[in-house]
Amino acid sequence: MSKRAFNFCAGPAALPDAVLQRAQAEMLDWRGKGLSVMEMSHRSDDYVAIAEKAEQDLRDLLSVPSNYKVLFLQGGASQQFAEIPLNLLPENGVADYVETGIWSKKAIEEARRFGSVNVAASAKAYDYLAIPGQNEWKLSKNAAYLHYASNETIGGLQFDWVPEAGDVPLVVDMSSDILSRPIDVSQYGLIYAGAQKNIGPSGLVVVIVREDLLGRARSSCPTMLDYKVSADNGSMYNTPATYSWYLSGLVFEWLKEQGGVEAMEQRNRAKKDRLYGFIDSSEFYTNPISHNARSWMNVPFRLADERLDKAFLAGADARGLLNLKGHRSVGGMRASIYNALGLEAVEALVGYMAEFEKEHA
């Protein structure tokens, strides 16, 4: 096997080598059945067993309470921007949203197509370098739900606390930091996460929803987007993204073998401490995000001279350090260090950054 590169892509992101090797071994002949998982009927006993095990492993990893449904859906997190208000926002109601970057802004824009949205707080007041404290938020009296994104992949802002919503259902986009550290699922009404960062390949979104929030969809809500329909049909109202679901199940198995989300928290803390520590000690690289809002998963940084960006990226690619270019909306660099990347990937990046700084500072 040729040497694997270190993939710092924000998504679709790196997958564990062990997962890819397992999928490769099972590609043509899954457990002696003589066919690939991609060829299985989603109604077959074998595939149903794959799907059920994936769900149970995810429940185990996150300690999901029994009064929550776990759904494996299609359309990615972006479809949830519409699906959430269609299911949870009454036509004459209002939903509270917190805007901390591009993804939460997209969620707000989509929700406005279906009803009234109150932007309770915005990081724009801090130039998207910090998250407003909840004492600054202007929440509605009777909001249908409170929505926020726990981690903004593009700007590199992450909540290190859970908002207090009282009796209002708390809805969170955890696409980029789910499974990176322990969470208390019972604090949320609904959690959703696109798969292609910390769960598996693209084509899948996981939704964890409290049962009392089911059955609230508008009459105009398409059947395919009704959470209750999805829950009642075991996420198989139509043919699901079978192979993405299977691969995600392999990732869940790998996570359990690694020690679960508690072990991932330690691993991710070491990675982010190493990378931010190097950036902060350098006079050549900068990250302006407030320290208590810095993302553990997505680390944006800039070089002292942006004219060196192309040379930096070319040198990184030559060393097998891939996809470090920042998002087109913000520029600079971005290292996405999800669960699948180990500390050795960060050490390789820091080593190259130090070398490049020595040559160009």
From Swiss-Prot:
It comes from the Bacteria. One of its GO terms (biological process) is L-serine biosynthetic process. Its main location: cytoplasm. Its EC number is 2.6.1.52. One of its GO terms (molecular function) is O-phospho-L-serine:2-oxoglutarate aminotransferase activity. Keywords: Amino-acid biosynthesis, Aminotransferase, Cytoplasm, Pyridoxal phosphate, Pyridoxine biosynthesis, Serine biosynthesis, Transferase. Pathway: Amino-acid biosynthesis; L-serine biosynthesis; L-serine from 3-phospho-D-glycerate: step 2/3; Cofactor biosynthesis; pyridoxine 5'-phosphate biosynthesis; pyridoxine 5'-phosphate from D-erythrose 4-phosphate: step 3/5. It is an enzyme of class 2 (transferase). It catalyses: O-phospho-L-serine + 2-oxoglutarate = 3-phosphooxypyruvate + L-glutamate; 4-(phosphooxy)-L-threonine + 2-oxoglutarate = (R)-3-hydroxy-2-oxo-4-phosphooxybutanoate + L-glutamate. It is found in: Cytoplasm. InterPro entries: Aminotrans_V_dom, Pser_aminoTfrase, PyrdxlP-dep_Trfase, PyrdxlP-dep_Trfase_major, PyrdxlP-dep_Trfase_small. Binds 1 pyridoxal phosphate per subunit. L-glutamate binds at R43. The modification N6-(pyridoxal phosphate)lysine is found at K197. One of its GO terms (cellular component) is cytoplasm. Catalyzes the reversible conversion of 3-phosphohydroxypyruvate to phosphoserine and of 3-hydroxy-2-oxo-4-phosphonooxybutanoate to phosphohydroxythreonine. Homodimer. Belongs to the class-V pyridoxal-phosphate-dependent aminotransferase family. SerC subfamily. This is Phosphoserine aminotransferase. The gene is serC.
